[in-house]
């Protein structure tokens, strides 16, 4: 059991936040602990494109990481190309998708498989449900005393990237809240 937290909602339509979001996921889903820069970068571009596409194009109730995963696994490469080609030229998802698209066919296939493997926890309906909407206010600790408990397994690292996302974004949100609302920041 867990309160729900839509990690994708923290992107708030900002490209820089999308980059941070993607970076945390890629760095915390390497099975060996040390990734290959080429593949990591390619997967980052594809994930950033999917995140920005969902964040900017979907209705609010469908803006979540599970929807980005569904795009990855349910659309063919041709269908993805059509989706991204239909975006306005200035759409922030176009540039990272364009970088992904410039690679060879075999590389693109490897990137899709690699990213799908990293995000395979979203095959689980419970994980999709927990990350589909917000019940947690990351700014609340700045407004009133409260505690959040983030329990992770000491034997299985499968879900560690979600706790890494949570901690990264809670620090960002609290610092921004303090800068805007507290005397002296």
Pin down the residues of each PLM region.
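P-loop NTPase motor domains
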Residues: 1-185
């Amino acid at each position: 059991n867990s309160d729900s937290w839509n990690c994708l909602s923290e992107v708030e339509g900002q490209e820089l936040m999308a980059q941070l979001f993607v970076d945390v996921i890629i760095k915390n889903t390497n099975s060996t602990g040390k990734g290959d820069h080429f593949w990591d970068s390619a997967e980052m571009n594809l994930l950033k494109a999917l995140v920005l596409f969902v964040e900017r194009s979907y209705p609010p109730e469908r803006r979540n990481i599970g929807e980005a995963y569904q795009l990855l696994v349910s659309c063919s490469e041709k269908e993805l190309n059509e989706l991204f080609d239909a975006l306005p030229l200035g759409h922030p998802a176009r540039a990272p998708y364009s970088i992904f698209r410039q690679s060879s066919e075999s590389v693109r296939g490897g990137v899709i498989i690699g990213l799908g493997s990293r995000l395979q926890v979203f095959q689980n309906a419970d994980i999709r449900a927990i990350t589909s909407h917000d019940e947690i206010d990351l700014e609340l600790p700045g407004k009133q005393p409260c505690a959040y408990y983030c329990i992770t397994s000491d034997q299985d690292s499968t879900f560690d990237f979600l706790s890494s996302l949570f901690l990264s974004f809670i620090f960002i949100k609290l610092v921004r809240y303090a800068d805007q609302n507290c005397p002296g920041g």
